[in-house]
């Protein structure tokens, strides 16, 4: 029964805890020249935009962006695409925005976007999960034809998947479109970032240093000693301790869910009455209390869909 309960389809929207320097009654003044130092559990090991889960890491570090993304209200938005039109079962047309640039100042036009997406589709098989190997073809400077291998109902959602980041090859490595660029990388140890001058509001950003600290107790000590300005991805227990100390603790929705799927074809779970009994017997609010975060699922998809 424990295994049955463990794998019951009962997804919770995850939350991530982070803590920032300062106390609620005080406001620290930080000089413009002082970098913001962030501790989190990992730093990317290599700048390889089509290898495994690396594109997700590059985006979380502020270096890259997917073609579409989800805003805080659950809407699919894009800095790059003005309009998406479906022309038939397998074909779509993207109309691009003008003036959006890579961090080297060159424009993200149809040729650049099509090259990036085709490279992703060819080199990272994880990008083929939703609609097969998708093909992108330049029509003119700001128009791209998209042909999917398998039918999809929402191309925007596909283009928001973490594999589908925009990038190009430069003389000294890859060039991206996110709010920051790399100043220095010590693989899997630390990453120093500086603002991408071609990204909006770049003048409001300063240098950022991300340090990899896998041990939560060590991260807590580093924050308390002043080595870190922010500790990201801390556990609920440590978040509670720091909040009790008067530190500023915030939570954000992680924006994804985990699912457990039952085998209803054979065994005890093939009996609908058993499934209904387990469903009624579980107190989902107790799960949230035990996990110290999240929300009760209202279906297979996040509530904003």
Model-derived features: positions:
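Local pocket/hinge segments that shape ligand/substrate recognition
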Residues: 235-305
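Ligand-site clamp/hinge motif
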Residues: 196-240
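Bacterial signal peptide processing site
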Residues: 22-24
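N-terminal lobe/hinge region of extracytoplasmic solute-binding protein
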Residues: 39-87, 118, 175
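Surface-exposed binding/hinge segments that line
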Residues: 85, 89, 128-169
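Gly/Pro-rich hinge or "lid" segments in bacterial periplasmic/extracellular proteins
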Residues: 75, 151-203, 207, 217
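Aromatic- and charge-enriched surface segment that lines or borders ligand/interaction sites
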Residues: 82-124, 268
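C-terminal motif of bacterial Sec signal peptides marking the signal peptidase cleavage site
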Residues: 18-20
């Amino acid at each position: 029964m424990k295994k049955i309960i463990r794998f019951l389809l009962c997804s919770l929207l995850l939350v991530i805890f982070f803590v920032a320097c300062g106390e609620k009654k005080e406001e620290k003044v930080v000089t413009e020249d002082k970098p913001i130092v962030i501790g989190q559990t990992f730093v990317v090991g290599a700048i390889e935009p089509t290898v495994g889960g690396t594109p997700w890491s590059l985006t979380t570090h502020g270096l890259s962006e997917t073609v579409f993304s989800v805003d805080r209200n659950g809407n699919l938005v894009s800095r790059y695409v003005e309009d998406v039109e479906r022309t038939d079962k397998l074909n779509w047309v993207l109309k691009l925005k003008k003036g959006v640039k890579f961090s080297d100042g060159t424009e993200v036009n149809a040729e650049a976007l099509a090259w990036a997406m085709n490279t992703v589709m060819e080199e990272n098989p994880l990008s083929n999960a939703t609609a097969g190997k998708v093909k992108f073809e330049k029509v003119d400077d700001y128009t791209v034809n998209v042909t999917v291998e398998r039918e999809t109902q929402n191309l925007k959602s596909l283009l928001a998947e973490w594999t589908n980041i925009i990038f190009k090859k430069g003389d000294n490595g890859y060039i991206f479109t996110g709010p920051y660029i790399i100043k220095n990388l010590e693989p899997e140890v630390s990453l120093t970032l500086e603002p991408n001058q071609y990204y909006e509001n770049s003048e409001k950003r300063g240098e950022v240093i991300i340090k990899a600290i896998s041990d939560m107790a060590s991260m807590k000590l580093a924050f308390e000693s002043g080595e870190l300005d922010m500790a990201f991805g801390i556990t609920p227990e440590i978040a509670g301790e720091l909040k009790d100390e008067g530190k500023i603790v915030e939570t954000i929705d992680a924006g994804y869910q985990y699912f457990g799927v039952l085998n209803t074809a054979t065994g005890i779970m093939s009996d609908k009455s058993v499934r209904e009994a387990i469903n009624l017997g579980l107190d989902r609010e107790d799960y949230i209390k035990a996990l110290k975060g999240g929300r009760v699922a209202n279906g297979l998809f996040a509530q904003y869909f």
